[in-house]
């Protein structure tokens, strides 16, 4: 059983997904960490991007409950992660890894940019977390000092790439987290899950 949490950079989806997983007693996977790890591998290895990204995609596996290393959110990773993520073969490998992991556990909250639209389009539990550009810039500044221009550029790249672009799945429930606390967003999601018939303690 998969609860899909999608949204743009710094929308708050990671904090929401992590907290939701704890509340539900499910596993939690940050799919973006896999792509960031692949990007780090490319930059550190000084190898041809496509070959290095493919090697990284095969090497890394979902690690539920393990927090991504802070270095994966450095500016240099931010600047290249979308390009690495756009390699179709990389997305194919990591998508299969994510699906295989989900099949191995009773329940998982998985967050990213295409979880509900491409990785698990069949799940009835899809959520898209958004926030204003100003709020997102404030949140990201605490991680890597990125400003609104950086986020706008990332949004453009993510939403216009050919392979699994950032889109809102047709049946996803959209939540604007700009003025909500993490608990507020999680509470809204749990309410929707109950309406859809999911047993939530």
Listing of model-derived features with the role each one plays in the protein:
Residues 14:
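Walker A/P-loop
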Residues 3-5:
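Hydrophobic anchor at the beta1->P-loop junction of P-loop NTPases
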Residues 7, 111:
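The Walker A (P-loop) glycine that initiates the GxxxxGKT/S ATP-binding motif of P-loop NTPases
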Residues 33-107, 117, 133-138, 146-159, ...:
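ATP-dependent small-molecule kinase phosphotransfer cores
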Residues 21-31, 44:
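Post-Walker A helix-loop "phosphate-sensing" segment adjacent to the P-loop in P-loop NTPases
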Residues 10-11:
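ATP-binding Walker
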Residues 124-125, 168-184:
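Phosphate-binding beta-loop-alpha motif at adenosine-nucleotide cofactor sites
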């Amino acid at each position: 059983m998969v609860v899909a949490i999608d949204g743009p950079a710094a929308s708050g989806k990671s904090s929401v997904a992590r907290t939701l997983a704890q509340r539900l007693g499910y596993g939690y996977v940050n799919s973006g960490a896999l792509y960031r790890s692949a990007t780090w591998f490319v930059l550190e290895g000084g190898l041809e991007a496509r070959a290095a990204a493919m090697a990284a995609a095969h090497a890394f596996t979902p690690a539920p409950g393990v927090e991504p290393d802070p270095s994966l959110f450095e500016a240099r990773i931010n600047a290249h992660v979308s390009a690495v993520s756009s390699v179709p073969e990389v997305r194919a490998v990591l998508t299969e890894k994510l699906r295989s992991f989900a099949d191995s556990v009773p329940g998982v909250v998985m967050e990213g940019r295409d979880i509900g639209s491409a990785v698990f389009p069949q799940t009835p539990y899809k959520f898209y977390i958004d926030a204003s550009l100003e709020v997102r810039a404030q949140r990201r500044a605490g991680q890597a000092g990125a400003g609104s221009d950086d986020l706008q550029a990332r949004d453009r790249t993510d939403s216009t790439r050919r392979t699994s672009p950032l889109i809102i799945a047709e049946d996803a429930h959209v939540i604007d987290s700009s003025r909500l606390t993490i608990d507020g967003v999680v509470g809204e999601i749990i309410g929707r899950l109950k309406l859809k018939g999911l047993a939530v303690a």
